[in-house]
Amino acid sequence: MWFRFLLAALAIFFAGRYLSDLADETADITGLSKGFIGALILGLITSLPELIGTLTAVLFRANTDLGVGNIFGSNLFNIAILAGAVLVFATRIKPGDWIHGSLFTVHMSICVAAFMVMLIHLLRGPSTGWWENLGSITILGFFTAGMWLYSREKSAASVASTKKGQRSLAVNIILIVILGSVVVAAGILLADSCDDIAKNTHMTATFVGSLFMAMATSFPELVVTIRLLEHGNIRMATGNIFGSNLFNLCIIAFVDLMYRGTIFSNVTGPQTVLLATSILMSGLFLIGATIRALRKTSIRLDNIIILVLYLCIYFWLY
């Protein structure tokens, strides 16, 4: 089971390596904002492991703890990735890049996560009827409307401004589909192996899902974020991370619509703490980004606090 876990994790890691270049080229070809490309294309593709893993765990393995833990744990790990990468590549990021449309996804992910905390408490207990899925429908509608508004932001580049040496849009789409297929297959294998790990060890499904499975499914975000920040591209990096987090929360809403009853009634206390912690970490990142946009500062206390919070929450969970 550990061999299958490592095999799936490596497949996700290497497939994710090439996604940032494809997304960057796609942004230049289409003329769409790089923050939007980061949030939509990168967010969607890098969230494929979470989607497939959670669907497999909840619907086919009947392991809600593993599936929900995977999503909430992935969101925590994603924010920790961004905080750590900002610390490492701080000198390559221009102060003026902090306030940009990419922070739109930070606000959206905070709103959806807070609404989800409310749903968890409102829907706790026995089934109360068809209307209990209205919360998930609201989340998906909010996401769709938000992405439509976000797509209105255009970059100065023209649609026809393909640089010499770039692949065509059609080739990029084909490559994204191929890499996405690899990630899907690896996500299924990953969910199966993590379910076996949880059943054959003394670790809980929530812990396995929110740590091991979450870290493995977040490898694309890890690779993409590092490669983007190596070039100081904080806009796409932020759009990628919080776009992925937003997609992840929508995965819970999507699975809820296919789940018998409501998945929110089965969310445990520790999982709710993970979700609430992601809201806190997102808020800290947003505060730090706002301060850096207003004045140049070398203080990175917000990122350090985020990383400490991440370590403390898993020490508590274990």
Q: What residue ranges belong to the model's regions?
A:
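Hydrophobic alpha-helical segments, chiefly the membrane-spanning helices
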Residues: 1-318
